[in-house]
């Protein structure tokens, strides 16, 4: 979800003074995970000017010469072909953004004073695409062709981005699945304000609404409980116009294309409360408006100019003749508003989310409305939607132009109560003295709860609070537990940890870091698409989280490489150098967990920033050398074989790693078609993915027995052996575990060496040395008895064709 600092400021005005770093800390603390931050670079030599006069270019019909005032006593002439300058009555004395000579625009244009058809032009009148080309895909056709016209601005102001809200900060956040209300910034801002200890402002005015007209058609819900609410407002005699650039800028920052002021309003309010709105041309509606479930297949032309065939049980909004919307998903062209519309039906619904999910998936429609309706929406949010609608519309129209609600409804501010014991809360938080009742009550109130003595009333939009322990979790969002007086932890036990695996992995990390690779850590949870991408080991069916924090954090990843490429993608967007990076992590599958190492490189190793061609060349040989270092860290050598599958890697520039006839990894060049997913198709990127589990367990797969301390001296013998070519280490484990006269055993060394005895090469070159501990119990053995026991073990191993 995109979260605009400018939108938050509608509810927390003073947040504009808070550093972005502090806001990130606050969002993470309350449970909204920040994935990235986007800010916009400012441009020099921009200034606010005022259109003084416009006259046609004497030598070009499609050009105008504009006299622009840029200060009290300074005027310049600028030639422009913008279509909106031809209607002088609408633009004279309005404000424009002027790029003066020397301005370097993000689209690559450097502004110079120049002669155009015999007339001098001193600068450039800017369109939005000139200033923020990265967001040009969210511009309407009108805004793509025309320069920016501002109704209000300060003449000569050089901080021009604030008029377009380009001076915004956009936080890309993941929302917990238990908090669908947070898709409405109004609700998120309430808790953000509590954490930051800032004042929260309720936008909605409380003025009484009167003199509304009666809607002249019926709005009916004819489904069987498929909507919590279905209704709307009628607006009459209103001429559509362009929204202000303040509104357009906010919508563009949230990846929403501005259309006209009424449609833009229907897209702006859901940013606040997460309940979508749809606008119909009321004059195109025949008869009454009804919400129904489809009983037959029927086609309609949608607002995206595509034909869809509705399926049985799809939720439809219809009039007496036709389909006017696939409810909650997309409208029909049959009632689309256009420049001739003057009467409107503003539809507001709260539909069954399971049906919306099913229909949107079947028709493959991914609209903003469908995404919001696929989450749980409370009736309280629907109520707030109408309040915002009336508030904003009444700043544009008279009361008599608006109707009353087609269907009234009431919602309690709070929908359940929880009885609390403040001593229990303090005990659970671990602070019996630090937290007085009043502080707990104030904290809960700031979070949106109503507190009356030992009763806490839960807001109607919250469906995740069931008991007092849930309230403690809420308190932890805003209480700094680091200030609590620490309570000592008493423990009468010790835990012995097996650190062999960690030591091996730490040693590997140090080796790679010494080679200038950067060790990073990324999230284990991702989207289904990303979980299945670059799945070189072909793990089946990624593990799914039952209550994910968001759709992009729903599946356990099945490889590390995808996340590493996402890191490259992010660094590329910030124009950072792409350094070699790696990650070591345990990947969870339905068959268990396996340690993997993933590594990617996009540049020569050890190269200098001033000379990218320096250093060790990036190719398959280099990545092969890296893989040798990794495998040898565990005491093994590996062989390399060609790959047959070219789904992800370039077939003739990739290899698979094989140890003892078992594939443990892959190295090679990632295909451009895959890199395109990460905006990295112009790079040559080599990767490595090794399953370390077999390398780890081959030397750690032994039984550990912890016994009480006794006074007997440990009796051990070291045995060195080799295994036959056709068997693995499990054969030795089976033998030694069947010998019940040992207390434990461990591997103390592994090495490769030729054996003069094995002239036929029947045995593997790897030699293992194990230390065997005699099980003593309460008996003291003589040297002869000890030798007899270990001779028994050796004879047993020989019977299993283990070479001693």
From Swiss-Prot:
Q: Where is the B5 domain?
A: 413-486
Q: Which PROSITE patterns match?
A: B5, FDX_ACB, TRBD
Cofactor: binding details: Binds 2 magnesium ions per tetramer.
Q: Where is the FDX-ACB domain?
A: 710-804
Name of the protein in its database record: Phenylalanine--tRNA ligase beta subunit
Recorded hits in InterPro entries, A to Z, give:
aa-tRNA-synth_II/BPL/LPL, B3/B4_tRNA-bd, DNA-bd_dom_put_sf, Fdx_antiC-bd, Fdx_antiC-bd_sf, NA-bd_OB-fold, Phe-tRNA-ligase_IIc_bsu, Phe-tRNA-ligase_IIc_bsu_bact
Catalyzed reactions: tRNA(Phe) + L-phenylalanine + ATP = L-phenylalanyl-tRNA(Phe) + AMP + diphosphate + H(+)
Cofactor(s) required, per the database record:
Mg(2+)
As recorded in Swiss-Prot or TrEMBL, the protein's gene is named pheT
**Which taxonomic lineage is given here?**
Bacteria, Bacillati, Mycoplasmatota, Mycoplasmoidales, Mycoplasmoidaceae
What is the similarity comment for this entry? Belongs to the phenylalanyl-tRNA synthetase beta subunit family. Type 1 subfamily.
* Superkingdom to which the source organism belongs: Bacteria
